[in-house]
Structure formats: structure tokens, C-alpha cells
């Protein structure tokens, strides 16, 4: 038994990346990318088979606010996981079309890394209640991303909320991304 993967969960600036660009040579995007490169080089030197992944903010302009450039990060990470939490309060207003578009945006921009869409297992209500989803509802969401986007997988957030469906075989007929 050993380590199969390492996930970088909060590899970003907290919405203020544009304030951390003291020169053309030193930028927020450069810092995040360099950290990915250093982690990649250190981990792959020990075990080239370890999967490296990172959670990314879902905004298309994540470079400006968070220092996350999927094109650059995708050179060093195996999987990019945009947090497409479209059932959550902050993103619900954007709707499903936005969510599917985010998955495609990251899949196109983040190559050669694969993209797994980060989806929630719960919904936020207008009264700030967190309501767990049943397995069928979560499966329906996952199926939409499998059938309608370039994403090659999903990540479900958050363990302990919602009923986890059987996702085995969901991507079996979808060609692997190159």
C-alpha cells in the first residue's frame, strides 16, 4: 500500500492575485505555476506514477483573481479539478449552461492535463440551508457532465453529504482525452 496521488486543494491567491505582481518577471500566475512545477519535479522524481491534481476556481479569469492559469498548471499536473459548484449559493445564479461551459473551458485550456468537474453532493437553498442530494440526483448531474462536456471525470464534494451513486462505467464509452 502506498500513495496513489497528491491533491493540491488551495493552490491559489484568495481573490487578490492581481495585487501580487511586483514585476513582469514575478507574478501571481508565475508563483502558482512555479509551485506546481516544484511539486511535480519532487514527486515524480520519487514515483513517476503518482497522480497530481489541483482544485481550481471555476471563473474563466482565474488568472487575474487567483493566479491559476490552467494552461500553465496543466503542464505539471495530471488532473485539473475546477470547482463547478453550480448548486451552491455563489454560483447557482449562473445555471447549468454556465457549469457545462466551465468544464469545457478548462478541458480546452488545461491540456495536457485531464479535467474532472468538481460537483457538489448538496444544494444551498435561498435560506442558506444545506440540503443533501439523493444518489439519483447526483448521478444525473454526473451523467450530464459525462455526456455533454470534455471533462473526463468528476469529483464529488463533499463526503458525508448526499448519497453517493455508483459511477462505475459512466465514462466507459467516452474516448480518453489526449
Residue ranges of each PLM-predicted region?
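A short acidic (Asp/Glu
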Residues: 18, 64-65, 166-168
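Active-site groove signature of glycoside hydrolases
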Residues: 1-26, 152-156
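Substrate-binding cleft/loops of secretory-pathway carbohydrate-active enzymes
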Residues: 51-89, 130-131
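Short, hinge-like loop/turn segments at secondary-structure boundaries
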Residues: 24-25, 70-72, 99, 172-174
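Substrate-binding cleft of secreted/luminal carbohydrate-active enzymes
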Residues: 77-78, 82-178
Amino acid at each position: 500500500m502506498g500513495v496513489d496521488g497528491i491533491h493540491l486543494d488551495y493552490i491559489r491567491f484568495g481573490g487578490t492575485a492581481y495585487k501580487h505582481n511586483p514585476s513582469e518577471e514575478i507574478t501571481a500566475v508565475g508563483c502558482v505555476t512555479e509551485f506546481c512545477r516544484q511539486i511535480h519535479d519532487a514527486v515524480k522524481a520519487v514515483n513517476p506514477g503518482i497522480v497530481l491534481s489541483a482544485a481550481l476556481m471555476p471563473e474563466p479569469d482565474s488568472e487575474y483573481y487567483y493566479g491559476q492559469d490552467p494552461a500553465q498548471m496543466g503542464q505539471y499536473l495530471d488532473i485539473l479539478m475546477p470547482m463547478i459548484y453550480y448548486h451552491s449559493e455563489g454560483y447557482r445564479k449562473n445555471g447549468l449552461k454556465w457549469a457545462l461551459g466551465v468544464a469545457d473551458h478548462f478541458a480546452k485550456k488545461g491540456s495536457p492535463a485531464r479535467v474532472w468537474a468538481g460537483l457538489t453532493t448538496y444544494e444551498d437553498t435561498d435560506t442558506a440551508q444545506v440540503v443533501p442530494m439523493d444518489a439519483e440526483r447526483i448521478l444525473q448531474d454526473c451523467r450530464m457532465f459525462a455526456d455533454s462536456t470534455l471533462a473526463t471525470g468528476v469529483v464529488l464534494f463533499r463526503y458525508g453529504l448526499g448519497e453517493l451513486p455508483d459511477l462505475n462505467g459512466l465514462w466507459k464509452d467516452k474516448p480518453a482525452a489526449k
